[in-house]
Amino acid sequence: MEPMYLQVLQKETGRQIKKLLVENGYTVKDVQNAMGFENPQAVYKWISGRSLPSLDNFVILSRLLHTSIEDILVIDEDIVRLWGFSFKLIVQ
């Protein structure tokens, strides 16, 4: 099997996290408390697109927001190669 390539769009993922927080009525403080963080800096970095949550935190975030990790991540033009065929997928 050939490798698959993708690019996570960090800033757009941050905007998606912020949008989902607003839609679900959560604040940064709510996420901070749910994650058990002493301060909200990590959450602010996520929504500003300066960093991404760890996999563990993505799982917690997806449960908090009642959605999947795939619905939180914004990915740009996957190139998927299977059995010698190439497919170009646009996921947003």
Which residues does each predicted region cover?
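The alpha-helix within a helix-turn-helix
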Residues: 21, 32-33, 62
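Residues within the helices of the helix-turn-helix
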Residues: 18, 29, 59
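Short, charged recognition helix plus adjacent turn
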Residues: 1-7, 73-92
